[in-house]
Amino acid sequence: MGTPKPRKQPMNIISFNTNSIRMRLHQLKSIIDRLDPDVIGIQESKVCDEDFPFDDIAELGYHAEVHGQKTHYGVALLSKTKPEQVFKGLPDEAGDAQRRLIGAAYQDPKLGKVTVINGYFPQGENRNHPTKFPNKVAFYERLNLLLETRFTPSENILVIGDMNIASVDEDIGIGADNQKRWLREGKTSFLPEERAWQQKLYDWGLTDTYRHLHPSGNDRFSWFDYRSKGFEREPRRGLRIDLILASQPMLKKLTKADIDYEARAMVKPSDHCPIWATFKG
């Protein structure tokens, strides 16, 4: 395992939908070199656990906890230090459920125990889809159950990941006509019922870190479609659907949060940008 940089006071958290981690190791190295994260939540690792690139991650100075499957889905938590506890999956999931959630508790010298829950939330496709939309409903319901039964809002909790919902209209950058068409056709990402599911997370006690620091920002997005070259267009066309949500104790320590466009501009990038937040003890 590589030697991590000396521990500094702030805790840096990154969430990154890699769209295949083995294809994005160059992006991972870039964000590690530039942002020096303590914990990285990976979504869409798209690799079964036995084929995960543990050696490559160790060379970057990180320990990996994984919950993956072949070809689709998959999540992981990469960290400078091993977590105290790890859990995988959601309450009442079937044994063959899609591998979409992993959580771990870390001991930070300044902040104390910090629990990071990392998820690749279902996209849902369309409210009329017979399986994908109900799967998205169930995922949000089970996540709420997890929070309500295992945690309290007074703890240091971070829920991070590709949440596949644009919470407010400022998170939508696909053009007014497309926005209206998506709503008219029932296409997922910002349907009223989806926003209601996300609101339950906020009601429990979580806050969107980026929106907290940038309340009126409407020109920064985390996902850009490959086919329409949304990242290359001017203005850029995308959605902000990757989030780092913090409980109130963590929110009080939040100092910075942003979206990393530099990684998205690299060759052979994921369609998602890494996002990050910094917490000072």
Question: In which residue ranges do the predicted regions lie?
Answer:
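Active-site beta-strand termini and strand-to-loop segments that position acidic
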Residues: K80, A104-K110, S247-Q248, S270, ...
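Active-site beta-strand/loop signature of hydrolases that rely on acidic residues for catalysis
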Residues: F16-N17, I32-E50, V116, L146-D171, ...
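Structured beta-strand-rich core segments of catalytic domains in phosphoester-bond hydrolases
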Residues: S45-C48, F52-N128
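Surface-exposed cleft-lining segments at the edges of enzyme active sites
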Residues: P91-D92, F121-Y140, K180-G186
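N-terminal, active-site-proximal structural segment of metallo-dependent hydrolase catalytic domains
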Residues: G2-Y62, H72-V75, L191
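Metal-dependent phosphoesterases centered on the DNase I-like endonuclease/exonuclease/phosphatase
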Residues: L60, F139-R237, I241
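Active-site-proximal beta-strand elements of phosphoester/diester hydrolases
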Residues: P10-S20, K113-N126, H272
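Conserved beta strand-loop-helix elements of the APE1-like EEP
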Residues: T71-V86, F231-K253, F279
